[in-house]
Amino acid sequence: MYKRSLIAASLSVAALVSAQAMADINGGGATLPQQLYQEPGVLTAGFAAYIGVGSGNGKAAFLNNDYTKFVAGTTNKNVHWAGSDSKLSKTNETNPYLSAHGSAWGPLIQVPSVATSVALPFNKSGSNAVNFADVNTLCGVFSGRLTDWSQIPGSGRSGAITVVYRSESSGTTELFTRFLNASCSSTLEGGTFAITTSFGSSFSGGLPAGAVSAQGSQAVMNALNAAQGRITYMSPDFAAPTLAGLDDATKVAQVRGVSPAPANVSAAIGAVTPPTTAQRSDPNNWVPVFAATANPNDPSVRPYPTSGYPILGFTNLIFSQCYANATQTQQVRDFFTRHYGATANNDTAITNHRFVPLPASWKLAVRQSFLTSTNNLYIGHSNVCNGIGRPL
């Protein structure tokens, strides 16, 4: 009798542990914020460890509830959220998701998490600061028009330039190609840069000769450091191990005389206003993107700033408004409460990773919309999520 009771108790404990493991809030995606989200305490209770696989895989995992995009071969887990520096396409991603899954899973939420620069670390010995005073020089390096360090005025260096780029679908690539698309002269470069998550297909004239690819931020940095003459585009916390490192122009290039340190993008970010109350029901309006000029038909498109470090953007969070499990619903609310809190929040960790916390006005807009029970956008709103939600 005792033995049977012991076995039964053991099975009950095993079932409980298994249920708890399966109930983790699983997420992953962009590698740009990977180190931030893996910092202890940034993700709140109930969240599984963040898995960095690139923005493209993160979006695909969430939109199709496909955990194999995080871990190949693992089919017994669900996906509950994603990180992406690449904004969801309303036409190609958000609307198809709502058509396929909206009735069963509910609406999705897309909001900015932190603001970021895109730095230009390089591996070429020399004592001179490297400064792309003229953006056309930067464009020439990444189009392949300029092939030697001596063609970068004032660099004090010579030898072949080798571009290192992300091989997978990357939101960091999208942020960078947005800038190239808006800033580079097609006449001078002999082609154009498309806004894309795939750098290999961005420039219409093809990749620079000898360009080297790698998958993920850390692998790109490893490739950068493997040989002299290499340059890449990178999130600030991978580009340099310290804040002071971002200001070291012998290792991380300046653009127009300005380093990618957070202080040099914070003013531009502070000038970006959150969506109005009437605009907040559309996930597209929550994520600002930069372009050469504003778009009168899309309030999320803002012109690039004319001062400060110019290559900048946001990394974003993608969640569902509805979760089938009440505990998970509350855990998602708890994370939003922490991340977008007025006083107790993740700002210290964000700053330590060389990112820029969202302005107070943005955090307030998020709390008003997704954490206020009387708002129709409230996470788990009973009128929206009655009997539906992303699976446990």
Curated annotation (Swiss-Prot):
Pfam families: PBP_like_2. Keywords: Hydrolase, Periplasm, Secreted, Signal. Residues 1-23 form the signal peptide. Its EC number is 3.1.3.1. Disruption phenotype: Strains are still able to make extracellular appendages that include PstS. GO terms for cellular component: extracellular region; periplasmic space. Gene3D superfamilies: Periplasmic binding protein-like II. It is found in: Secreted; Periplasm. Induction: Suppressed by inorganic phosphate. SUPFAM superfamilies: Periplasmic binding protein-like II (SSF53850). One of its GO terms (molecular function) is alkaline phosphatase activity. Homodimer. Belongs to the PstS family. This is Alkaline phosphatase L.
